[in-house]
Amino acid sequence: MKRTCKYLAFGAAAVLIAMMMAATVVERLQGTPVAFQWFYHSPLFIVLWAVATIAGVIYLVMEGTPKRLWTMGLHVGLVVILTGALVTHLFGTSGSIHLREGETTADYELDDETPAKLPFGIRLEAFAIDYYEGTRRPLDYRSDITFLPKGNAVRISMNNIAKYRGYRFYQADYDEDGLGSILAVSHDPWGVGITYAGYLLLLLSMIGFFFEKDTAFRKALRRVATMTAAVALFALAPAPASAQSMPEGMGMPRKEASTPDFMLTSKAKVQANELYMAIARPKVQFMLCLTLGIVLFVLGAVLISKKRKFPAWVLHGSAVIALLMWLYLTLVIGLRWYISGTGPYVGRYNVMMLMAWFSTLAILLLYRRFPLIEPLGFLLAGFTMLLASRESVSPQIMPLMPVLRSPLLSIHVVSMMMSYTLFGLVAFNGIMGLAVPSREAKESLRDVSLVVLYPAVFLLTFGTFLGAVWANISWGSYWAWDPKETWALITMLVYAFTLHGGALKPFRNPNFFHGYTIFAFVCVLVTYFGVNLLLGGMHSYM
């Protein structure tokens, strides 16, 4: 019975991963309605989630997991989240309402284009667009409305919703003449609350898990602590990316105004911009980091297999180069921040340069104690600067889109990119694990990967679900199966398999484990780059 439940749970999860991958491709080729009909809203998709949940709970109980409070809490939190999603699917409604200034109506349209009626009236008093000073770049969209017959007046804007009698209203779009507004309407009195309760339980359990005794994480950590390899990987932590869907027109102008990239309002900013434009492309820097990273990587693999340490002159010389790279990155990021007035949280160029900044900083802080951080850190810095160098020759510095002006942006983005960076370290560690001939070295590197994977998966989970909260606050849907969020979920599930070596025997084999972590990183690449470049969705602005 226990074995049957185990295979049902993990088997259903594997099929769900395959279905979600296929769904994002079908959506690109055939459109969103077809993807929802064939996959996301299909009976098979729902049944598979139910099978994975029920079989998983039975297996956990039979395995004795309830005795481990926080481990059980992680899984119960996921069950609560899925329960909330089911309630939303069965009983929640959403749609849109079109208003013209001075018009009163109770009629709106559901997402499936079915007419519906509100139990009250709503009137648009005025609609306006605020712009960044000196530009035609939208800063915010505002709808002043009144709920009738009581006459409650409210203002709806980006990240500022209206709630009335169990309904929530969000700024979604507007008419070309500026005299009309389109509001998203959501009515889900139970599903959101249940889902949020699951998010909270999951967060508390993820924190508590690191203090729980005799978990696979604690055992791997103890083994890693006894060797001179890279416990340092655990400490590496960078920043930005995103994972929630945005309705069309929400916070993104349909036509960009033909304006200067940014209005530089002082002589100091003009001079800073000239310096920034002269040094912003890190071509020499990425080539140096990649070359040094590859050399140190090969040297590290040889030394680990022979149980020897890095020569001191190699470590200190590499640290000097890391310091120069860090100073360069600090200057570029600082100039960009000063000129734009916006932190480096949005855009591929910002993301890649900030990842490189954290990578070089980690080398400086940790290389004396954990030498393996040098090859992995240089490789990450090199690859991320390579990607940054392939962005536009003159990276535009633009104000944030209205929907991105949220305090949740930096937290969401930082947690997602921290997880992606840690997954990158695990992938490089996996390559080294396959390269070294010693079985003992392979096992040790597997332990290093496990120590990194737990916080990486938890950060990805936290960032994804925080993005869901942000989406619900901003446009009324905490999960809309946008390709970006779907691939974030796929990545989460793919990496979750690596944390279940106790139940899945292949993951106890170091060669299989290292090979799997390399394959799994492809999911990260698809999530961040593939969705933007190939699959589309509303995250391509990132």
Feature-to-residue mapping (PLM):
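Solvent-exposed, non-transmembrane regions of integral membrane proteins
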Residues: 1-542
